[in-house]
Amino acid sequence: METADILVVSGAFFFAAFVKGITGLGFSTTALPFLVYAIGLKEALPLLIVPSIVSNLVVMRDAGHFQQTLMQFRRLYAAAPVGIFIGLVVLMWLDPTISSAVLGLVLIIYCVVSIIQPTFRLPTHLARQLEIPVGVTTGLVNGITGSQVIPVLPYLLSLPLTRDVFVQAVNICFTVSSIAFAIGLAWVGLFTIDTTQISFIGLVAMLVGLKLGTPIRDKLSHKSFRKAVLGLLLLLGAGLVLRPWL
């Protein structure tokens, strides 16, 4: 990878971590569209592994309720890797512009859900029945696009969870998915020593962005900044969807 590309990757990681520090929006989801525009989806996916796992582990440590949450959603977490491996097979078969368009659609759905923040509630029995399908589908979308938020995010939002349990549930899912994704990427030949080294370089930029973003949280209008970032991601997602026809 050229020096210019490494600088772009580091810049995307810094910005995504800075945004995460201020708003709590997902690191990978924010960084991914910038990387796709710069270097392509298949090239971008392995670079996110190390920073994603590290950032998720930090949040998992701080959120608490680990064992309780792990047991509550164990079937969902066990199902996600199955979908990831299927999704990676599909990714290797798909035309890159199509998989990028799917990512764009996922980003649009994510932004709409995040902006609207629906308050619907799933009945307990239905939520239980949907655990495995949601896990497999989230893994499938993850394998094809690299995004880990759909449909697990709206699913967890539909449950009566406390904020800490919700954050922990999301981050356990992200961490399990990232580890399975790393194994899958290595299996299909995308996660190599070179990409690992670049991923560690990006980790430094991510940590700096997170450190600088977190103290600013109380000084900026959190809601306005969050909506601005979501609006930007929405535009980037729309661009990825329209790209094959432009």
Q: What feature does the model see in each segment?
A:
Residues 47-96, 179-223:
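Selective hydrophobic functional segments
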Residues 5-6, 11, 36-53, 97-107, ...:
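Structural signature of hydrophobic alpha-helical transmembrane segments
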Residues 1-38, 121-170, 177:
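Selected transmembrane alpha-helices and immediately adjacent juxtamembrane segments
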Residues 38-41, 63-70, 157-165, 189-192:
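Juxtamembrane helix-boundary/capping and inter-helix hinge elements in multi-pass membrane proteins
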Residues 42-45, 97-100, 129, 164, ...:
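Residues that define the loop-to-transmembrane-helix transition and helix capping
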Residues 56-65, 96, 102-127, 214-215, ...:
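Transmembrane helix exit motif
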Residues 44, 86-91, 140-147, 181, ...:
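Hydrophobic alpha-helical transmembrane segments in multi-pass integral membrane proteins
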Residues 11, 15, 50-57, 74, ...:
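Hydrophobic residues within alpha-helical transmembrane segments
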